[in-house]
């Protein structure tokens, strides 16, 4: 199995406008689940903001452990390791969809939020 992602990690990191999110980037072509890898590296002490990225997930999971179809090179599959105070964690389900929709709108697309955390563009769910 090839584990070299198409993502150019150096270019990706050069374009980041953050001090921590995505600065530690673990990019793979195919892994079972970005969430599982993120959990493992977090337990091993990965820093806040570590980004686990994959071109494909062979055992991806969505909410409540539901199977998540993750074909190669069709979508963005990633998980962040976040080391934040509990009070911030509780607000993330509200904050993140707002931030994602805003970022998409800044690129000229009409992103809509379907609560609690789905983002839709032109009647299609995009995340």
Locate each region found by the language model:
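N-terminal lobe of the biotin/lipoate ligase/transferase fold
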Residues: 1-109, 126-127
């Amino acid at each position: 199995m090839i584990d070299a992602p198409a993502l150019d990690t150096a270019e990706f990191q050069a374009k980041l406008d953050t001090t921590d999110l995505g600065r530690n980037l673990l990019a793979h072509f195919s892994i079972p689940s970005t969430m599982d890898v993120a959990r493992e590296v977090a337990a091993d002490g990965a820093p806040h903001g570590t980004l686990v990225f994959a071109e494909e997930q062979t055992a991806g999971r969505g909410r409540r452990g539901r199977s998540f179809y993750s074909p190669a090179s069709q979508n963005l599959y990633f998980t962040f390791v976040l080391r934040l105070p509990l009070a911030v964690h509780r607000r993330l389900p509200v904050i993140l969809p707002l931030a994602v929709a805003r970022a998409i709108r800044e690129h000229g697309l009409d992103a809509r939020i379907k609560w609690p955390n789905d983002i839709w563009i032109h009647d299609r769910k995009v995340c």
